[in-house]
C-alpha cells in the first residue's frame, strides 16, 4: 500500500460539509497537542501535510487527506481549555455528526501521550468508541521523551488501563525517531483489507 501519494482534500467545519464516504477512512482522534499532525506527517513521509501547530486547539475542522486506497481523517483536537464553550460545542457536534453517519471506517487511531495518564476527555472518547463498536487502536506518542525505565513503566500502566477492553492494540510511537511507524502502517493496511473483505 502506497502511503506517499497523498494530498489534502477537504476541511469540513459543519456536518453538512462532510464529503461523500466513497472510500475507507482511517480516523485520527486525540487531545489538543498530543501529536496527531506529527503522526500523520510521519506515516506519509511529509514534513507539513498536516500542519503542526505550537498553539493547541488550532484544528477547528475535520480535515480529509486522500491517498490512493483510503482517506486519513483528522478530527479536531479536544480538551483545549482556552477555547470558548460555544466553539467546544461546535467541535463536539461536528465530531458526533461525523461518527453518526454511515461511513466506511475500518479503523480509528486514538492518540494518547505516553508520558501522562489519559485525561477525562481521553477516557470519554475511548468509552464512546468502545460502546459504539468502532474498531480502534491506541497509539502512544512521544515515546522518545522517556528513558527506558520510565518508558516500560508507562507501557505497563497503559496495558493495565486497557486490560478491560478487548482487542485494542497499544502501539508506542515517536515522530522524532519513527519508532512504531511501520507497525501502524501495517495495522492500517490490515484493517482496510479486513474491512473490504467484510463488505464483499
What are these regions (language model features)?
Residues 45-46, 88-91, 125-128, 154-157, ...:
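Glycine-rich, phosphate-binding/catalytic loops in enzymes
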Residues 68-105:
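Conserved nucleotide-sensing/catalytic segment adjacent to the nucleotide-binding pocket
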Residues 96-168:
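Conserved C-terminal guanine-recognition region of P-loop GTPase G domains, centered on the G4
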Residues 58, 70, 77-80, 115-117, ...:
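Conserved nucleotide-binding/hydrolysis micro-motifs of P-loop NTPases
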